[in-house]
Amino acid sequence: MSRLEIDKVSVNYGGRGGAQTLALSQVNLTMERGDFVVALGASGCGKTTLLSCIAGFMQPSEGEIRLDGKPVLGPGAERGVVFQKHALMPWLNVADNVALGLRLRGVNRAERLRIAHEKLAQVGLEKVASKPVYQLSGGMQQRVGIARALANDPEVMLMDEPLGALDALTRESIQALILRLWAREQKIVFFITHSVEEALFLATRLIVMTPSPGRIAHSYDLPFARRYIECGDARAVKSDPEFIRYREEIVDLIHATP
């Protein structure tokens, strides 16, 4: 079973004149297969820094991150990343964008295109596989980014505000898509957002982080993602009195967190 461990992780950024900025301080977090963990907090609380450490884009100043007992020392195919900006290659068509990671790993063309078409079908884009990515809407481009991350069959999906630039209706549609994919794949998901409602809807566990330095101030185990999978009605889930109570509590908590 996949297991991601964040063990006493701190990150210092160096500044001019040798000044140090403590971005993360003594963060401890364990995630296992099927966990959907959402990090929420004010700007500057270290959410993206933490995701970058998990992805292997940077190393902690202190502490260690382990996946299945092995230290994370750099990027790897077992960790897929979806960014706020889709980061697609404009000179490649949709299918070749999805297959890019497989190509870099040496997978033959027939097999990587088979996988690309399979993942595009999962995100509802099988009919646009041959189109240039610049012809797609923002929401469709982000779905291509999700399909590309899934193509390598990672153990962990890292999602850094992937829906932040989308309109409200598209955002809700892709929230539901992400949950359906999570329910089917049962991967570890670590997701960053500034939206309290989005965090409550997606998370099986929600962590609220303090700003400067970033620490985990509160953690909530939540039922709403699984409720959506059971009923398929996002509006019913989000209008439930329990959902609204959590939303108000967490908004108050974020405003009160120093």
From Swiss-Prot:
Keywords: ATP-binding, Cell inner membrane, Cell membrane, Membrane, Nucleotide-binding, Translocase, Transport. One of its GO terms (molecular function) is ATP hydrolysis activity. GO terms for cellular component: plasma membrane. It comes from the Bacteria. Disulfide bonds: none annotated. InterPro entries: AAA+_ATPase (IPR003593), ABC_transporter-like_ATP-bd (IPR003439), ABC_transporter-like_CS (IPR017871), ABC_transporter_ATP-bind (IPR050166), P-loop_NTPase (IPR027417). SUPFAM superfamilies: P-loop containing nucleoside triphosphate hydrolases. The keyword Translocase applies. Part of the ABC transporter complex TauABC involved in taurine import. Responsible for energy coupling to the transport system. Residues 4-236 form the ABC transporter domain. The complex is composed of two ATP-binding proteins (TauB), two transmembrane proteins (TauC) and a solute-binding protein (TauA). It catalyses: taurine(out) + ATP + H2O = taurine(in) + ADP + phosphate + H(+). Belongs to the ABC transporter superfamily. Taurine importer (TC 3.A.1.17.1) family. This is Taurine import ATP-binding protein TauB. Its EC number is 7.6.2.7. It comes from Cupriavidus pinatubonensis (strain JMP 134 / LMG 1197) (Cupriavidus necator (strain JMP 134)). It is found in: Cell inner membrane. It holds the Pfam family ABC_tran. ATP binds at residues 41-48. It is an enzyme of class 7 (translocase). The keyword Nucleotide-binding applies.
